[in-house]
Structure formats: C-alpha cells, structure tokens
C-alpha cells in the first residue's frame, strides 16, 4: 500500500496541483492565521520537488536557514517566502476578495 507521503510527492510533481496545494494553504492562512500549517505545506512541497538542499541552491538561501524558517517556530520574511516559491516555479499573485454579482 502506497504511503500518503509518497502519493503526495508524486502528485506535487504536477505544476497545477503544486500551485493549487500552495494556494489553498495560503488562502487558509489568511482565514485563520495558522502560519505553522502554511509553513508545513511549503516544506512538504519543497521536499516533494527535490528537497531542501536543491531548493536552497535555487533560492539562494542557506539550507540550515530554510530548516529553521520552516520549523514550527519558524520566523520568515516575505522575501524569503517569495524566493522559496520562485525556486518551486511559483509566484505570489493577489486577487480581489470581493465577489461581483
């Protein structure tokens, strides 16, 4: 039986699924301000897409700093989040919270 982590790693190889996964976590963060959940989701995506060592090189952020940033007590800057997302092939975008009828 396939482990969930293996299943998730396989699914996150798809660019659209990866983007949706991160977007859902980010949108949830804006609802409940659960930073730990967002950082855990980002860490899962990084591991699925080659690991922290690979992403640290692409993001130009020290590997140990990424481990610390993504820990449950991690404190990260907006710039570092952007760098990690860019290394994953993603970017932040904004959209209106208003629903037009």
Where would I find each of the regions flagged by the language model?
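N-terminal flexible/basic segments that precede or flank functional cores
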Residues: 1-41
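Short amphipathic alpha-helical elements of helix-turn-helix/winged-helix folds
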Residues: 24, 44-45, 87
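Short basic helix-loop element that most often maps to the first helix and adjoining turn
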Residues: 39-56
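Recognition helix of helix-turn-helix/homeodomain-like DNA-binding domains
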Residues: 60-76
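DNA major-groove recognition helix of helix-turn-helix/homeodomain DNA-binding modules
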Residues: 77-95
């Amino acid at each position: 039986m396939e482990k969930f982590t293996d299943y998730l790693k396989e699914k996150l190889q798809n660019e659209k699924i990866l983007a949706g996964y991160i977007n859902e976590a980010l949108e949830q963060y804006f609802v409940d301000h659960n930073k730990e959940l967002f950082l855990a989701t980002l860490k899962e995506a990084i591991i699925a897409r080659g690991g922290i060592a690979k992403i640290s090189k692409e993001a130009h952020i020290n590997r140990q700093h990424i481990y610390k940033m993504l820990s449950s007590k991690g404190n990260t800057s907006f710039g570092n989040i952007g760098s990690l997302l860019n290394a994953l092939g993603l970017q932040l975008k904004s959209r209106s919270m208003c629903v037009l009828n």
